[in-house]
From Swiss-Prot:
Family: Belongs to the zinc-associated anti-sigma factor (ZAS) superfamily.
Cofactor: Zn(2+)
InterPro entries the UniProt entry points to: Znf_put (IPR027383)
Keywords: Cell membrane, Membrane, Metal-binding, Transmembrane, Transmembrane helix, Zinc
Membrane protein topology class: Single-pass membrane protein
Transmembrane parts of this sequence: 71-93
Pfam families in the cross-refs: zf-HC2
Organism field: Bacillus subtilis (strain 168)
Cell location: Cell membrane
Protein name, per record: Anti-sigma-YlaC factor YlaD
Function of the protein: Anti-sigma factor for YlaC.
Positions bound to Zn(2+): 29, 33, 36
MF terms (GO), sorted A to Z: metal ion binding
The keyword Zinc is assigned to this record: yes
Amino acid sequence: MTCFLVRDLLPLYLEGDCKRETEHVIEEHLKMCSSCRDMYDTMAEPFELESEQAVEEAYLPEEELRFKQRYYGLLIMKAACWFGAAVAMMLIIKLLI
């Protein structure tokens, strides 16, 4: 089996989703090919994900937070004005009819 195919199948092999024959062929290839074995070792190592708060802080600097507060504040004000105008129009129409 070529390195290309083994590298393509490594995620399935690690998850245990390969057939027995395929697992055997991959294991034999890993014994002979140090490059694929290194890739296997790298993929098999567990890794830590950053905490959600750390990621949030990295992507939301203070200026962006201020911008969002202003933007959504204005959006709410506009929506309230449009709602008020619609209610006023409905009252005027009701009084005229």
